[in-house]
């Protein structure tokens, strides 16, 4: 009965989405925006029903109910509870239900908490969100039913892919889906604004928190996924330019451009049409990623579906949503008047340059991702790998980082080139010093891109904190700290990428217990092989010690694991982290002569890559807390920022509109 209840909740949510769409259409065509009061409870009920449906699927996985086909093919009765829980979305159908649930809850949040938009724009936004949700409901119910029964029911189940049996599964996919859905909400805002001819700064301020939240979540998801692949797959790399990796990167690039564009629109009332177009592009990249993962055209640890009919369904949704949005854009573009103008030397111009460069990178990654698939469709196999992306997209990415550092040092509207050059003097000096230092230490021993990466990272790090110079730090707004930390995080990640590419040392040996392996100043002693067992796996563990210089030996334990359900051999790398890098050890197979394959990497400063990613997400979070709308009104309580006050100073108003007006007047006077 649990499965039937979950399916019924899903059908009812789909019916409510259809009702929501109908109410919005009727309200807009009859000019009755007051129908928004009727749309809100429908959106709320839809969110509750999708959450209920997903909770029931989680219950089926935790109970190991093998009478449900999805549980039988993606779980096992002997699996630890964490992987039963996370395994709910470690498959095509479950992950799509998670997607639909997040979309339903997002629609509920827009219905309940959005108060800045005009009522007709708000209603049109909810209609667009209902339209998107309806398509995914149809996809789930007609081609990917997560509650289908297994007949006959197996006793234990087939088990989850061992590569997915990692705590990363509990964090990486959900954060990506949350980010994708956030972009769908931004898309709905854009469609709603076009339908009601309401593209202005107020609309941008309403949309910006969703874009920022989606961008933060995508940043966290990509960072977590990169580290998960790094330590789980045992190949020593953190990004392979896999098509499905690119499928998450492309929405992030579009969201980054959109975030900067909507900031210009929200604060300076410029770039109206460009912001709408970027909102469409960002969501379209999410849909492209969905198609790549679920169409069956890719074979990857990331890919779910092998049914081309599902890919056709998603392709139809992509054509409907994006084609419809572009048609609407072309129809309404004449009504979208550009707002305030700005001079060539201005922060707005720097943000436009940032947008254009990010768009170039997005286009290059999209071409490199889709070109092999298109040529294969015509019978020709072409491989596009890291050399293409590194050599083509890498230099543009470095230019983006430079523009990112210069932008905050330029004034809004109009500035003087000489004044901007003066503010960039210190970062430029640091960049030249870094050039000299790296040249002395590594000239001729590293590639051009890593060399430039190290040099630019130093200059950008200084440029990122430059907005704090000569400021009263106690009175600096929280969103400024967020911007500084996020930009500094980009420099930190760039330094980690460049150092890893330039200075990584790799050694592959065949060793017996008792052997000592020396590489990059480390001594790794291979002591013994010990059989061990886990909840649903057995392993041969390499007992080793690692030491450097006069330091004490440290135990490390790489493993060669075997999972019985399904039967799979995997490796578990041993990682030893130090301030200046990470020792990465992988135990391979045993040869006939009793020697074991051991692969060792010393990867200087590689952890800066993920530290920088977390700093970027932290900076985005501070900006979200400190800047968005500078006030929050919900349940009759109003909180507003006073722009001139110290960081974190809030002025709280009461529940009556009179107090709200007082606070608003104080902010204006300030």
Across the structure, where does each feature detected by a protein language model lie?
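Membrane-interface interhelical loops and short amphipathic "cap" helices
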Residues: 1-9, 32-37, 59-93, 145-173, ...
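Contiguous transmembrane helix-bundle modules in multi-pass membrane proteins
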Residues: 1-34, 45, 52, 66, ...
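Extended, highly charged clamp/arch subdomains and adjacent linkers
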Residues: 2-85, 93-123, 135-146
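A conserved hydrophobic secondary-structure block that centers on an alpha-helix together
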Residues: 11-17, 21, 95-226, 234
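Membrane-interfacial loop-to-helix junctions in multi-pass inner-membrane proteins
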Residues: 29-51, 112-134, 195-216, 241, ...
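Transmembrane-helix bundle segments that line or gate the permeation/cavity pathway
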Residues: 53-72, 93-100, 104-107, 141-148, ...
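Conserved active-site neighborhood of enzyme catalytic/cofactor-binding cores
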Residues: 213, 223-230, 236-237, 243-288, ...
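Soluble non-transmembrane domains of integral membrane proteins
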Residues: 508-599
